[in-house]
A protein has these predicted regions:
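Intrinsically disordered, low-complexity terminal regions
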Residues: 1-278
Length: 278
């Protein structure tokens, strides 16, 4: 079990194929790595584990599978490291599960699953796979193919570009710039401006409290909820669909310090503008 003295946060670079990786970040002054075959009775799993390289130099931990594992997973890798360490992961049919606070993270995924707890920032290129992140403190830049992205809280701006898939954000505190060829966007709450464009997909904002929403879908429904205490300027149109705008029909009877603007267009689909559920 390799152990390295690390009194400060480090960079953990993981390059794996057919691996299950677990990262635990906590208040500690060393880094410990454990590499084990998932099936000790499997000669191929034993080979992948024995050929996995672990090295530490210049503040960077490197873990690399030199022999590709099975797509079901051949090697289990556990990394315990200092809180706020950076994670750089290159993954092929692998999974990463991280607990505890990490610094800036960089993901390059051919396929796989990633679950991160609390990170500082994100740079990601995802060909395929699923990513779930509890909290991002600063900027996130995400691009790739058809993937599923879930973010509980985004404190910084988010830029996302994909060919397809789905993106869900629980609470966006800063601006969002989202685009997809055939993806769906689902935002529970947005406290800043949103630009969302998809050629074929649905766009939903559960609650918009501030800023401007510019929403465009070639084929798909659009739904926006607006807070009760927020005045709204609405400009929406569907070429081949129904428009239900209960906010404009109610008017803004009382002065409000909060105002949002909604500009929405879809060619094939319905548009719903309504007051957000309390």
């Amino acid at each position: 079990m390799p152990t390295f003295a690390t009194p400060a946060p480090i960079t953990a670079a993981v390059q794996v194929a057919g691996a299950q990786v677990r990262v635990t970040a906590s208040d500690r002054t060393d880094t410990v790595v454990l590499v084990e075959p998932i099936n000790e009775a499997s000669a191929s799993d034993l080979k992948v584990a024995s050929k996995t390289e672990v090295d530490f130099a210049g503040g960077q931990l490197t873990v690399k599978t030199t022999v590709s594992g099975d797509k079901r997973g051949s090697v289990a890798i556990a990394i315990d490291l200092p809180a706020d360490s950076r994670l750089v992961a290159n993954l092929a049919y692998s999974s990463v599960h991280a607990d505890g606070p990490l610094g800036a993270c960089e993901l390059h995924m051919a396929s796989g699953q990633v679950q991160l707890d609390h990170i500082d920032a994100l740079q990601a290129n995802i060909a395929a796979g699923e990513v779930a992140i509890g909290h991002i403190a600063r900027r996130a830049n995400i691009d790739g193919g058809g993937f599923v992205m879930r973010i509980g809280e985004a404190k910084g701006t988010v830029g996302l570009s994909s060919s397809g898939g789905q993106a869900w954000i629980g609470h966006a505190f800063a601006d969002l710039d989202l685009s997809s060829g055939s993806g769906n966007f689902d935002i529970d709450r947005a406290d800043a401006s949103i630009t969302a464009t998809t050629a074929s997909g649905a766009i939903r904002i559960g609650r918009l409290t501030h800023g401007q929403a510019k929403l465009m879908s070639g084929s798909g429904d659009i739904e926006v909820g607006i807070s009760e205490d927020t005045a709204a300027s609405i400009d929406v149109n569907s070429e081949r669909g129904a428009v239900h705008d209960s906010v404009s029909s109610q008017g803004n009877s009382e002065p409000s310090d909060h105002r949002v603007m909604v500009h929405a267009r879809t060619r094939h689909g319905d548009i719903i503008i309504q007051r957000a559920a309390s």
